Amino acid sequence: MKNIRNFSIIAHIDHGKSTLSDRFIQVCNGLSEREMKEQVLDSMDIERERGITIKAQSVTLDYTARDGQTYQLNFIDTPGHVDFSYEVSRSLAACEGALLVVDAAQGVEAQTVANCYTAIEQNLEVIPILNKIDLPSAEPDRVAQEIEEIIGIDATGATTCSAKIGIGVEDVLETIVAKVPAPEGDVNAKLQALIIDSWFDNYLGVVSLVRVKNGTIKKGEKFKVMSTGVAYQVDRLGVFTPKMKDLDHLKAGEVGFIVAGIKDIHGAPVGDTLTHAHNPTDKPVPGFKKVQPQVYAGMFTISSDDYPDFREALEKLSLNDASLFFEPEVSQALGFGFRCGFLGMLHMEIIQERLEREYNLDLITSAPTVVYKAIKKDGEIIEVDNLSKLPEPGAIAEIQEPIVRANILVPKDYVGSVITICIEKRGVQVDLNYVGNQVSITYDLPMIEVVSDFFDTLKSVTKGYGSLDYELIRYEPANMVCLDVLINGDKVDALASIVHKDQAKYKGRELVERLKELIPRQMFEVAIQAAIGGTIVARSTVKALRKNVLAKCYGGDVSRKKKLLEKQKEGKKRMKNIGSVEIPQEAFLSVLKK
């Protein structure tokens, strides 16, 4: 066990984490030259295209160090985006050390700081590595100082490397061997294995990635999942090199996969503990929290025939994604669908893209909302993640909205514009520190403002250099109202939203103007209104199409013309009473995209 090293890499998007892992695999001969491709571990197409890591992956490599000994390196790749911080905390729970990879040209970013603190809280040895030193703009000394000032880790003499051209990769491996502690644990104790990740394979069923804390698990043995108490038999186990390599057993300190023919998605929940069926351990591996969705949205298929496929697709995805929540929902405008809970906006976009791409579904997503608390006059507290759960306005004493503490790191040239957008989003400044070239700004912001389009706005005003990390800190009372959209007097449930009273008129006007352009003209007038309770705050009218009924009259008597015009008027009136307005899908999509 003294020659095992379990570590993961903490890095911001684009700081070269996946490239560095490619180099590790190359140096340790994990794959042949023919099988090597860029970003080996980012196995989903969408991960490659966006250049981000979403799922945690693992690789076991044998490295012969300069001291002549062979070490088993278990490397768990982690995502860098704030939405996937739960994947990060899970991966870190299986390690003893973490490499903090920082781009020597760009410096420290907010999400790196957050993940780094998670690692320090879990008592991991954090080792700073400066990557991309081949770039002409690299300033390793300045960045090392930034790491010390912002994160508080000693970065003097930090290992430098360039993963892209392969300089210094062996130095990084030597640093891992020297500084990451060997795992603790007893091979002869009762089995305790932590499930880091589970995914569904069409041929094998559920494949679980586990870190054995104590004991040994062998092929053919029976084990049970502690939270459910159900027992299974091990069909296959082994490690990823990154290909699947079968072994006879996994012992304490090792990381590998287990296949036990589990068919049910929830049979091996992520974060659970496995133990022997006949000689179980008493306590599960600690340090695991259930993740709560932060953003909710309704998802509907464009054609109702796809509903069963949609349900199956969500069930399969939720196996690979412990943080996805969904329940059935019915909307008058959009039909049957699901109310889904996500960690954040990127998570929502990625789930939608995976559903559309991997399962060929056409989806509409309703406007994202967060969880509000409605306190009724009788003292009852209702958690509102869906507008249909909101009580009548007369019964509500107050509505509380979630507030997040946002840490924003930006180059000092952009401070003014960042403060401006924070104020526009109803933010309250908590702190502002200058650290070298960077400025760390802390704001308390309403969560709904952060999840709608704050990240995009931040990126555009800081030319892409701003980075953001946020966490929910409290709920506080706010003057929120429900903004309904009426078309010819009928409410359209899919377009309703909860907004702050100060912004309601502006939002309502913007919404009706946008709908006016999107709803095609009918044979009768269409009134589009935005309302708060019984008060109309904005209105716009789609004018009627008009057929020229006088065309066949030529000269003719004026009373004859009047009669025809009156008849047309009557018809339009009747049509308006009974005609229903077809709202095209594009109208929903473009309104909800905002």
Swiss-Prot record:
Domain tr-type G, first and last residues per copy: 2-184
Disulfide bonding pattern of the chain: none
Enzyme class per UniProt: hydrolase
Domain of life: Bacteria
Membrane topology label: Peripheral membrane protein
GO biological process, one term: positive regulation of translation
CC annotations in GO: plasma membrane
Subcellular location: Cell inner membrane
Keywords noted in UniProt: Cell inner membrane, Cell membrane, GTP-binding, Hydrolase, Membrane, Nucleotide-binding, Protein biosynthesis
EC number in record: 3.6.5.n1
Molecular function via GO: GTP binding; GTPase activity; guanosine tetraphosphate binding; ribosome binding; translation elongation factor activity
Catalytic activity: GTP + H2O = GDP + phosphate + H(+)
Residues where GTP binds: D14, H15, G16, K17, S18, T19, N131, K132, I133, D134
Pfam families: EFG_C, GTP_EFTU, GTP_EFTU_D2, LepA_C
Function comment: Required for accurate and efficient protein synthesis under certain stress conditions. May act as a fidelity factor of the translation reaction, by catalyzing a one-codon backward translocation of tRNAs on improperly translocated ribosomes. Back-translocation proceeds from a post-translocation (POST) complex to a pre-translocation (PRE) complex, thus giving elongation factor G a second chance to translocate the tRNAs correctly. Binds to ribosomes in a GTP-dependent manner.
NCBIfam families: lepA (TIGR01393), small_GTP (TIGR00231)
Family indicated by similarity: Belongs to the TRAFAC class translation factor GTPase superfamily. Classic translation factor GTPase family. LepA subfamily.
Protein name: Elongation factor 4
Name of the gene encoding the protein in the UniProt record: lepA
